[in-house]
């Protein structure tokens, strides 16, 4: 009689499922706990702000008048359009300045990469209060030293309350670190040397190559840089208030004393718009990645 070996006897048997280790369960529980705490940390203040804006103090019910009254609020249209114009101009100037710089450094002048990175990081090292004090001192030269000269007229033109170009120039400097990092990440992820060489071999000029080849390859990076710049400009308060210009953030602070619920409603709405822009950029990025993989 033939006896089966242990290996042969268990060949057709199904192995029992491996037990879940307690360490993995604990790690999963800790993850959920941390995410729950972070969610409460962000959602509780937002929920309290929303409740503060929709609560009717007089009758004790709920109302949406503070949200519906935003477009007709005194000074809202002027401050919002001014900040939006400043944001658009800042984005255009920053991209016109940094896109050719990043492409040139990565394609032709790689030795200058460290120098350019250090220069673009300077606004993060320099406090905004120190920057605005320096700008204010320079602007004071116009009436003190250059009165009745073309330079003084140029200084005065930069400080027009309707569209303060001096804020655009300062915001471009503040946005350089974010714009450079976003564009540099996109350039490193794209095969720009091959793309530009192919375009040049087909007879395209450098401006045509930059517009038709480089910018489409860096579309997501350009969107990220633009969004970061818009968020910076729409939320900047210190420089605008010290230089004496009314922008969207300074308007919110100004009305917070007389209309606190309206100011909080505007802040909540701005936060929601920011989230929507983030979701749109993420959706475009995922859509582009899906097209590239397919």
Across the structure, where does each feature detected by a protein language model lie?
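Interhelical loop and adjacent transmembrane-helix boundary motif
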Residues: 21-28, 67-76, 234, 240-292
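Short membrane-interfacial helix/loop motifs at transmembrane-helix boundaries
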Residues: 29, 37-74, 294
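Transmembrane alpha-helices
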Residues: 33-42, 122, 166, 173-184, ...
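Membrane-interfacial helix termini and adjacent extracytoplasmic/periplasmic loops
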Residues: 64, 132-172, 240, 244
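Transmembrane-helix boundary motif in ABC transporter permease subunits
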Residues: 89-121, 133, 186, 214, ...
């Amino acid at each position: 009689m033939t006896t089966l070996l242990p290996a042969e006897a268990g060949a057709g048997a199904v192995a029992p499922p491996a037990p879940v280790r307690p360490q993995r369960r604990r790690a999963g529980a800790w993850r959920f706990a941390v995410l729950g705490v972070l969610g409460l940390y962000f959602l509780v203040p937002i929920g309290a702000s929303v409740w503060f804006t929709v609560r009717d103090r007089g009758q004790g019910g709920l109302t949406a008048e503070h949200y519906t009254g935003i477009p007709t609020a005194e000074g809202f249209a002027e401050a919002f359009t001014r900040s939006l114009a400043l944001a658009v101009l800042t984005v255009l100037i920053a991209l016109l300045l940094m896109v050719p710089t990043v492409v040139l450094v990565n394609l032709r002048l790689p030795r200058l990469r460290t120098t350019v990175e250090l220069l673009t990081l300077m606004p993060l090292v320099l406090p905004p209060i120190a920057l605005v004090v320096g700008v204010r001192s320079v602007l004071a030269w116009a009436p003190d030293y250059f009165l009745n000269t073309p330079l003084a007229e140029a200084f005065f033109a930069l400080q027009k309350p309707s569209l303060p170009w001096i804020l655009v120039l300062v915001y471009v400097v503040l946005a350089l670190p974010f714009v450079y990092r976003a564009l540099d990440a996109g350039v490193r992820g794209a095969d720009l040397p091959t793309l530009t060489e192919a375009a040049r071999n087909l007879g395209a000029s450098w401006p045509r190559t930059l517009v038709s080849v480089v910018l489409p390859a860096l579309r997501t990076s350009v969107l990220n840089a633009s969004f970061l710049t818009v968020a910076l400009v729409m939320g900047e308060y210190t420089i605008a208030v010290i230089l004496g210009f009314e922008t969207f953030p300074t308007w919110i602070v100004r009305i917070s004393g007389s209309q606190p619920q309206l100011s909080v409603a505007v802040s909540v709405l701005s936060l929601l718009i920011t989230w929507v822009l983030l979701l749109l950029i993420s959706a475009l990025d995922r859509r582009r990645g899906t097209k590239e993989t397919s």
